[in-house]
From Swiss-Prot:
Function: Water channel required to facilitate the transport of water across cell membrane. Probably involved in root water uptake. Its function is impaired by Hg(2+).
GO biological process: hydrogen peroxide transmembrane transport; response to water deprivation; water transport
Motif NPA 1: chain residues: 107-109
PROSITE patterns: MIP
Entry's transmembrane regions: 40-60, 84-104, 126-146, 168-188, 202-222, 250-270
Annotated motif NPA 2, positions: 228-230
Extracellular side: 61-83, 147-167, 223-249
Record-given protein name: Aquaporin PIP2-1
Length: 287
């Protein structure tokens, strides 16, 4: 793949100091034969399990400490700020740990956005999403096992639309929140930025985790903050009450729409690589 060139006044054309990686093949049969592929799937499973275990346990703990009827105190526990830190901090830690193995997705919406941008193949995207959902179920299952007396009483960490908010408001909150997250992922992992600033790959988990933190601060009062279909799915499966299931579609449709908008914006508006990705889709279809 030839390097991109750009015009410099008075100097004609010069080679850029970075190279865009080629689009991932739509279906890559060769990667299915590699151990590294399945190792990455396992990493996504374990990372999502740990993510749900720590974060849902934090939510349950906060509700226990703030329940005055059960001996808690008003404004007790970590509060919304602490919950947001738990989600953002765990994403920072887990992305840092798994980025070199699986890319550190830990979220079907992130995987979907990267697939649309041709960063991952279809088989990888599908297996990642399955692994993330299974990991989420197991993670919340551990919370229920260790906090069986409190888990159901305090809502199981399940996402649902808060009273007083319309379905449209909840859906918009999930779309915008996921857009912020996936847009941050694209920006933090941009090969152009990584090539010019050698510290960027090391620091990439920090803005991603901080984006999760900020979105939680904004949307916990509305939906409990999904922006991660696996997180919402795992909690809904284990809690298994009607309210989370009634609202559950919001936590798949919203994040996937937000991820698609972020992928389109980054690839087609901010970068010229979008046309190349679209062309490779057409080439794959004609093979």
């Amino acid at each position: 793949m030839a390097k991109d060139v750009e015009a410099v006044p008075g100097e004609g054309f010069q080679t850029r100091d970075y190279q865009d990686p080629p689009p991932a093949p739509f279906i890559d049969g060769a990667e299915l034969k590699k151990w590294s592929f399945y190792r990455a799937v396992i990493a996504e499973f374990v990372a999502t399990l740990l993510f749900l275990y720590i974060t849902v346990l934090t939510v349950i703990g906060y509700k226990i400490q703030s329940d005055t009827d059960a001996g808690g105190v008003d404004c007790g526990g970590v509060g919304i700020l602490g919950i947001a830190w738990a989600f953002g901090g765990m994403i920072f830690i887990l992305v840092y740990c798994t980025a070199g193995i699986s890319g550190g997705h830990i979220n079907p919406a992130v995987t979907f956005g990267l697939f649309l941008a041709r960063k991952v193949s279809l088989p990888r995207a599908l297996l990642y999403i399955i692994a993330q959902c299974l990991g989420a179920i197991c993670g919340v299952g551990f919370v229920k096992a260790f906090q069986s007396s409190y888990y159901t009483r305090y809502g199981g960490g399940a996402n649902s639309l808060a009273d007083g908010y319309s379905t449209g408001t909840g859906l918009a909150a999930e779309i915008i929140g996921t857009f912020v997250l996936v847009y941050t992922v694209f920006s933090a992992t941009d090969p152009k930025r990584s090539a010019r600033d050698s510290h960027v790959p090391v620091l990439a988990p920090l803005p991603i985790g901080f984006a999760v933190f900020m979105v939680h601060l904004a949307t916990i009062p509305i939906t409990g903050t999904g922006i991660n279909p696996a997180r919402s799915f795992g909690a809904a499966v284990i809690y298994n009450k009607s309210k989370p299931w009634d609202d559950h579609w919001i936590f798949w449709v919203g994040p996937f729409i937000g991820a698609a908008i972020a992928a389109f914006y980054h690839q087609f508006v901010l970068r010229a690589s979008g046309s190349k990705s679209l062309g490779s889709f057409r080439s794959a279809a004609n093979v």
